[in-house]
Regions:
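Hydrophobic anchor at the beta1->P-loop junction of P-loop NTPases
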Residues: 3-5
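Phosphate-binding beta-loop-alpha motif at adenosine-nucleotide cofactor sites
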Residues: 124-125, 168-184
Length: 201
C-alpha cells in the first residue's frame, strides 16, 4: 500500500511525508534522495554523466527511515540533480527499485515529484503538496541558501522535462502548505485517507 506525496522543491513534502509515515506506522522513502545520490556520484566521479548516473542508479536502493546526508542538499547538487533525473534510463532503474521496495512492505509513504503520476499511478492515495514561492525560498534558505530564482529555475526544469515531469496527478488531493504547520498538513491528509476508507488509528 502506497501513499504518494508529490510536490515542488521546498514545499514541505519531506517533513510531511516523514511525519505521516510515523503516524501511520509505515515505511518512509524519500525518492529524491536517490536522485541526489546519483548526482553526487556523477559530480564526484568526474565521469561521463549518463554512464555515471546509470551506475549510480543501479548502486543505490531505497533506505526507509534513513535521513539523506546534508551534503546532498548543497548548491552544486541542486544545480545538477534535475539534469541527472532527466536521464530516461536512470528514472527507469530507480522507478523499478521503488516499486520493488513497495511490494516488499505492508505500507509505505513515498515522496518525490512523480510518485503519484508515474511511479504508482494506480494508488488511490495521492497528495500534492505546494506552497508559495516566497515561503518555499524561506524554507530552502535554511538548507542551502537557495533563493526564489533558483527555485523557479528548478520548477521550470522539473515541469518541462520529457521523462516523468513534475505534474499534478488528476486524482491527487492538492494541499497548499504555505500557512499550515506540518501537523496541520498531516492532519488533512489523514482525514482524506479515512474518507477513502483507509483504516487509520
Amino acid at each position: 500500500m502506497v501513499v504518494a506525496i508529490d510536490g515542488p522543491a521546498a514545499s514541505g513534502k519531506s517533513s510531511v511525508a516523514r511525519t505521516l509515515a510515523q503516524r501511520l506506522g509505515y515505511g518512509y522513502v524519500n525518492s529524491g534522495a536517490l536522485y541526489r545520490s546519483a548526482t553526487w556520484f556523477v559530480l564526484e566521479g568526474g565521469l561521463e554523466a549518463r554512464a555515471a548516473a546509470m551506475a549510480a542508479a543501479h548502486a543505490f536502493t531505497p533506505a526507509p527511515g534513513v535521513e539523506p546526508d546534508p551534503s546532498l542538499f548543497e548548491a552544486r547538487i541542486n544545480a545538477h540533480v534535475s539534469a541527472v533525473s532527466s536521464v530516461p534510463e536512470v528514472r527507469a532503474v530507480l522507478t523499478e527499485k521503488l516499486r520493488s521496495f513497495a511490494d516488499s512492505v505492508p505500507g509505505v509513504v513515498m515522496e518525490g515529484r512523480d510518485i503519484g503520476s508515474a511511479v504508482f499511478p494506480q494508488t488511490p492515495y495521492k497528495f500534492y503538496i505546494d506552497a508559495s514561492l516566497e515561503v518555499r525560498a524561506q524554507r530552502r534558505a535554511g538548507q542551502a541558501g537557495a533563493g526564489s530564482d533558483d527555485l523557479q529555475a528548478r520548477d521550470r526544469t522539473d515541469s518541462t522535462r520529457r521523462t516523468s515531469p513534475l505534474i499534478i496527478a488528476e486524482d491527487a488531493h492538492v494541499i497548499d502548505s504555505s500557512r499550515l504547520t506540518i501537523d496541520g498538513v498531516v492532519g488533512e491528509i489523514i482525514g482524506r485517507l479515512k474518507l477513502k476508507g483507509l483504516a487509520v488509528a
